[in-house]
């Protein structure tokens, strides 16, 4: 039974390749002029992921902070952004923000790309913050107490004890 299952899996992976080659040769590939959107999409995703990670970590730290103003502001931002659909944020970046921001001469298309980068970054940061907050809560309180007993300060405890363990715990959630 397992041998047949393995053969079916191998066949399922190998049979689409000749079919794909036939389709590409018979009907032609994608016109290179249509690849511009793909590159822009990859650029937007990379910028959003890289820029949202530090912002998300700061928001998660703010949400778990003992300072009420910081905690409330972080919580309000995260809940507001997570409660609004991404398409709404993108439409606001496209249609509403130009009315409030000064226009730079001749950079309208690039301005739109920058606005979308910021919108994706702010949206992704809220979700990263929630994942990191879960990781921060997963670190046992005894770790912090042990670090305090050793005389470490708050920044050292966060940087050397809490954040490495929290980020290690949330890698699957961030990647998936």
Where are the model-predicted features located?
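Transmembrane alpha-helices and adjacent helix-loop boundaries
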Residues: 1-176
